[in-house]
């Protein structure tokens, strides 16, 4: 975090506190989603809601939001139109009509956002599209998302001059091998980006994890961040945005704030149904700068017939990264891992190691394996480390 702070320190002073907004990316408005909107309205300044999506083949899908739930939350709403960065044919006229159509369905919108992760070489064409789109918005503010890789282009400044504001994405930008979020790299991206824009900008930060699946030859098969693990590759790993690392990054931004930085946009609003996102309590803790922490506990639980379940417990009110290793007591003769854990070969004492282990939710107990140990074996185990986010 020292490198992050150093990189950001050169960017400016310390104006008013950063505001916190959230993306609502869920397609279905479930009771859990409505509950999350209501529960977080006290610290969320605005909602950015997925309103439409243009897929790779050009088809546009429009999503229906719960306007009642949004109105009850009493915060500004910004509909987002997502355009697939791999779009085969960019029909500017048709897309412009779709964006204007979305805006007519959101008459009270505080702005409209275009989320288009286009290749850097297409920035001039994208700028031309935005230049023609803006007059059609009738005075509604225009926001766009941006990628750190664009900072190396001479065309970026012209693009950013068109939009009223932008949102820089600093999560899940690199290859999956690099993880979801690296604070030092993100800080360097923010520092570079701030030199290209003279309009307000925000930073998109993650509240989620991803499961990455690989083929036998080591090539990437799938990255699953919003759905259950469906891909069946030869191997898989769980990536996790550490709440502690993200909170420290935000605190660094607040202490050494780049000029023009208006706030944070969190991707995405956590709900109890979202098994790949932080809990609401964890997200609130990161935003407020106070994470409730307590050491994880491990123990054996009698499972009958001489076997025991290996349990890991999180007594804290916020999520915790799963331990990277769980060492069983000396004398245990057989063991194996479950739910993302496996038995490390040739270890004494027998040790379970994490491969795909998911974060441990607040106040949760999870079985991570089983063991056969002699009667009277101590039930307290040894755990260490956390996976790298």
Where do the model's predicted regions map?
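Catalytic domains of carbohydrate-active enzymes, especially glycoside hydrolases
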Residues: 30-57, 105-111, 259
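Chitinase-like catalytic core of GlcNAc-active glycosidases
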Residues: 17, 22, 51-168
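Asparagine-centered strand-capping/turn motif at beta-strand->loop junctions
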Residues: 302, 309-322, 328
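Substrate-binding cleft of secreted/luminal carbohydrate-active enzymes
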Residues: 208-210, 214-294
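Short, acidic/polar
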Residues: 28-40, 91-105, 150-157, 243-254
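Bacterial signal peptide processing site
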Residues: 12-14
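Conserved, mostly hydrophobic/aromatic
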Residues: 47, 114, 166, 203, ...
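Substrate-binding surface in catalytic domains of secreted glycosidases
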Residues: 124, 128-235
């Amino acid at each position: 975090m020292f490198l992050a702070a150093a990189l950001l320190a050169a960017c400016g002073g310390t104006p008013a506190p950063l505001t916190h907004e959230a993306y609502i990316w869920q397609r279905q408005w479930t009771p859990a989603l409505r509950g999350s909107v209501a529960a977080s309205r006290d610290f969320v300044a605005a909602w950015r809601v997925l309103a439409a999506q243009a897929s790779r083949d050009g088809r546009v899908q429009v999503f229906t939001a719960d306007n009642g739930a949004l109105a009850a939350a009493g915060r500004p709403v910004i509909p987002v139109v997502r355009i697939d960065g791999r779009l085969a044919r960019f029909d500017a006229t048709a897309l412009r009509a779709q964006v204007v159509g979305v805006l007519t369905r959101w008459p009270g919108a505080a702005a409209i956002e275009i989320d288009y992760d286009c290749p850097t070489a297409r920035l001039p064409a994208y700028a031309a599209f935005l230049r023609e789109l803006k007059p059609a918005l009738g005075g509604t503010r225009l926001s766009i998302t941006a990628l750190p890789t664009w900072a190396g282009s001479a065309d970026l400044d012209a693009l950013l001059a068109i939009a009223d504001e932008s949102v820089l994405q600093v999560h899940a930008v690199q290859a999956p091998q690099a993880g979801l979020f690296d604070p030092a790299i993100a800080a360097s991206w923010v520092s570079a980006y701030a030199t290209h824009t003279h309009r307000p900008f925000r930073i998109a930060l993650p509240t989620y994890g991803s499961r990455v699946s690989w083929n036998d030859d080591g090539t990437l098969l799938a990255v699953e961040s919003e759905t259950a693990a469906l891909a069946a590759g030869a191997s898989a790993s769980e990536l996790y945005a550490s709440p502690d690392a993200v909170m420290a990054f935000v605190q660094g931004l607040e202490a050494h704030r780049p000029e023009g930085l208006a706030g944070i946009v969190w991707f995405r609003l956590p709900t109890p149904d979202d098994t790949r996102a932080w809990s609401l309590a964890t997200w609130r803790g990161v935003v407020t700068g106070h994470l409730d922490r307590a050491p994880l506990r491990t123990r054996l639980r009698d499972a009958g017939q001489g076997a025991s379940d290996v349990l890991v417990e999180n007594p804290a009110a916020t999520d915790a990264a799963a331990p990277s290793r769980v060492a069983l007591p000396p004398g245990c003769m057989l063991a194996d891992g479950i739910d993302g854990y496996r038995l490390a070969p040739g270890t004494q004492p027998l040790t379970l190691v994490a491969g795909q282990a998911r974060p441990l939710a607040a106040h949760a107990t999870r079985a991570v394996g089983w063991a056969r140990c002699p009667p009277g074996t101590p039930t307290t185990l040894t755990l260490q480390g956390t996976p790298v986010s």
